[in-house]
């Protein structure tokens, strides 16, 4: 069984699986190759920055950019690339980059994995400093890469994240396999 066989969650869109590609604290961007199912080094970040939290995607989804729905998982520890985390969405960050709309879902580990975030139901309940770190990272992590840029537009709440997941699942069912 590979990642293509993994469902989008235990009870999506509220209870999702996230395949971790990039561990918290990494200065390397890893990416799962769709054809082989192997995680490749995409690039070393040109900036002296690191991913503030674990980063991955929801399997069997397709976002507007043609890739699976991206997720940043707020967590206490780095998680190995290729691991699957059961998560709960809490919101999303709308951005644009050189290729167009680039939305990032924000999630927390399911309470059975880590109860630390069980009281956080929406992105607005995260401490302001966490939201600022996330925003700062995405605004600056591509700065030294020729021709690349990012503009953070705004934070969206839980309901928008739920709709984004539903849309990603539907897009996948319509031919994203």
UniProtKB/Swiss-Prot annotation:
Task: Supply the source organism's classification.
Answer: Bacteria, Pseudomonadati, Aquificota, Aquificia, Aquificales
Q: What is its main location?
A: cytoplasm
EC number(s) reported in the record: 3.6.1.1
Is Cytoplasm included in the keywords of this UniProt record?
yes
Instruction: Give the required cofactors.
Output: Mg(2+)
UniProt-recorded name of the protein = Inorganic pyrophosphatase
Magnesium among keywords: yes
Source gene?
ppa
Q: Which InterPro entries match?
A: Pyrophosphatase, Pyrophosphatase_sf
């Amino acid at each position: 069984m590979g990642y293509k066989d993994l469902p989008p969650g235990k009870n999506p869109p509220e209870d999702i699986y996230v395949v971790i590609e990039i561990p918290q604290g990494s200065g390397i961007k890893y990416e799962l190759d769709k054809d082989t199912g192997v995680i490749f080094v995409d690039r070393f970040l040109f900036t002296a920055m690191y991913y503030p939290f674990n980063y991955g995607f929801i399997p069997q989804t397709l976002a507007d950019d043609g890739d699976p729905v991206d997720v940043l998982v707020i967590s206490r520890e780095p998680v190995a690339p290729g691991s699957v985390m059961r998560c709960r969405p809490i919101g999303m960050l709308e951005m644009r980059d050189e290729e167009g709309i680039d939305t990032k879902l924000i999630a927390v580990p399911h309470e059975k994995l880590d109860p630390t975030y069980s009281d956080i139901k929406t992105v607005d309940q995260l401490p302001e400093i966490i939201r600022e770190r996330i925003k700062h990272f995405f605004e600056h992590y591509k700065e030294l890469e020729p021709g690349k840029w990012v503009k953070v537009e705004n934070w969206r709440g839980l309901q928008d994240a739920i709709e984004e997941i539903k849309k990603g699942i539907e897009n996948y069912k319509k031919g994203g396999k």
